[in-house]
């Protein structure tokens, strides 16, 4: 028979209320007592009655808040697909997902959305955090007040999240540089386009790219680095500027969304396929460009799986009392025309 909270309380010589606090990760219990109760529960293979809890919450759902960056990036649209898939799967267990889409990459907007979700009484939150001290402070304040917060896609030191879901973007940048080095002249000249310096994932990709080039391909030259905020129109403008300004442009490295803008500019400048193109995220447009040879390779990060994992992780923590591992890493997937 499954062990009960009453039995654990008797063996630990504490009240059932104390055991309930420990198993539901609530404050008000001494560390030594908490450790003792957890050890007993583990030895007895205690399994929480999450179905009973879910039946209660089906009448009063647990609300989860998810904050996404603007959806003009197809990667975000795929994230949303994964979130919606998970919401459909877990709604029967008393989960309601509130998804908020940012319209810019400005910290003030993200802070406003965080406050909206707090007002909506969410019990857990998944945030694609901007690299801003006020954002860090607000998120950490929520965590200190017992809200379950996970971050995704951009990992930022100093945020004390429940866990991080996403890719090692520094590794992704190094992978891009290594692949480019293998298919290019040793002194190739590169134009770089990143989304925003407010997103650590793009900074990490850039740093990984630069470090790998410095270590293994020291004669490669980065001509310029500009932001496009994930907008294809800005990617188009920046790429055309690179083509006009740098006659020896040999490659474009795009860490962000906007691949259609890059390819359109190269076609107008009659630089494609001579200029090599490396990008991140496997979208329908990227697949089309890989197949026709205008993109050399792309690095994927399974956004549908990532979006699903956000809801699943918060569900398991809040309903099943399963604490996630500190980092749920999404592997770097190298895609070429031959692997499609």
How does the language model describe each region?
Residues 133-171, 283-291:
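Flexible loop/hinge segments that line or gate small-molecule binding clefts
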Residues 88-107, 190-192, 213-233:
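Short beta-strand elements in bilobed, periplasmic/extracellular small-molecule ligand-binding domains
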Residues 201, 213, 302-340:
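Hinge/cleft segment of the Venus flytrap/periplasmic-binding protein
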Residues 1-54:
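N-terminal helix-turn-helix DNA-binding module of bacterial transcription factors
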């Amino acid at each position: 028979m499954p062990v009960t909270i009453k039995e654990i309380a008797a063996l630990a010589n504490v009240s059932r209320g104390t055991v309930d606090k420990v198993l539901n990760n609530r404050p008000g219990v001494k560390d030594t007592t908490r450790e003792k109760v957890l050890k007993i529960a583990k030895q007895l293979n205690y399994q929480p009655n999450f179905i009973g809890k879910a039946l209660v919450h089906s009448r009063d759902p647990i609300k989860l808040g998810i904050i996404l960056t603007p959806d003009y990036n197809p990667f975000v649209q795929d994230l949303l697909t994964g979130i919606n898939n998970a919401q459909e799967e877990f709604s029967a267990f008393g989960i309601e997902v509130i998804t908020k889409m940012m319209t810019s990459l400005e910290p003030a907007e993200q802070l406003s959305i965080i406050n909206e979700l707090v007002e909506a009484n969410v019990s857990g939150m998944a945030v694609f955090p901007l690299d801003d001290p006020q954002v860090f402070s607000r998120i950490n304040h929520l965590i200190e007040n017992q809200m379950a917060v996970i971050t995704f896609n951009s990992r930022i030191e100093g945020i004390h999240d429940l866990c991080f879901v996403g890719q090692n973007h520094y590794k992704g940048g190094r992978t891009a540089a290594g692949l480019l080095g293998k298919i290019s002249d040793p002194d190739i000249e590169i134009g770089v386009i990143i989304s925003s310096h407010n997103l650590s994932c793009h900074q990490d990709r850039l740093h990984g790219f630069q470090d790998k080039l410095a270590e293994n391909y020291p004669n490669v030259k980065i001509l310029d680095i500009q932001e496009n905020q994930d907008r294809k129109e800005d990617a188009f403008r920046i790429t055309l500027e690179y083509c006009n300004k740098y006659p020896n442009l040999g490659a474009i490295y795009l860490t962000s969304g906007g691949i259609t803008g890059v390819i359109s500019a190269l076609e107008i400048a009659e630089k494609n396929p001579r200029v090599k193109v490396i990008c991140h995220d496997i979208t329908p447009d990227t697949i089309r460009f890989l197949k026709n040879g205008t993109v050399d390779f792309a690095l994927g990060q399974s956004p549908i799986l990532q979006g699903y994992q956000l809801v699943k992780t918060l569900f398991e923590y809040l309903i099943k009392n399963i604490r996630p591992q500190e980092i749920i890493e999404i592997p770097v997937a190298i895609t070429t025309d031959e692997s499609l």
